[in-house]
Amino acid sequence: MTTLELGRLSDRHPPFKYSALTRVWFSDTDAQGVVYYGRYLPYFDHARVEYHRHLDMPTVSRSGREFVMRASTVEYHAPARFDDLLEIFVRVARIGRSSVTYEGAAYRVEDDALMVTASQTLVLVDMEERASVPIPDWWRDKLRAFERGDLEE
C-alpha cells in the first residue's frame, strides 16, 4: 500500500538528510503570540514519523514491541509565530543496543532562521514484559544505509 509522504529528502542542513514541513496554527501559539514551547514536540514527532515512512520503516509494533520516549531535550533559539511555515529536519544520530537517539532542528522557511533544536532518545520495549529489547538488524540496516557515515553506533 502506498501512502502519501509529508516529508522530503533534503541536503540544505547537513548532516540532516530528511525534513518535513509544518505550519504554525493559531492553536499552537500562547498568550505572547509565539509557538507554545510544548508544541514543538509534536512537530518533531511528525518529522520522525515521516522519516520512518520514507524509509519504509513502519513501527515495530507488529511484534508487540514499541519505541517509547526515554529522554527529550529541546533548546529554543528564536520564536515562531502564527502562520509561519517551518521545516523540521530529523536524523538518527546514534543507535545503541535497544535505543535510538534522534536529532532535530526546526527552521522558519521564509528566512531559514533556526527556531529550535532537539535531541530525543527512544528505547525499544517489549510491551508485555515492559523491558527493553534489542533493535532488530533489519531496522539497523535501513538506518545505516540512509544515514551512511553520520550514524554513531
List PLM regions with ranges:
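HotDog/MaoC-like acyl-thioester-processing domains
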Residues: 2-20, 76-82, 93-153
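Catalytic strand-loop segment that frames the active site of acyl-thioester-processing enzymes
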Residues: 2-57
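A broad, structural micro-motif
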Residues: 35, 67-69, 115
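Residue-level recognition of specific faces of alpha-helices
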Residues: 40-43, 68, 121
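Short beta-edge strand/loop motif at the mouth of beta-sheet-based domains
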Residues: 54-55, 60-66
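Helix-adjacent hinge/juxtasegments
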Residues: 63-95
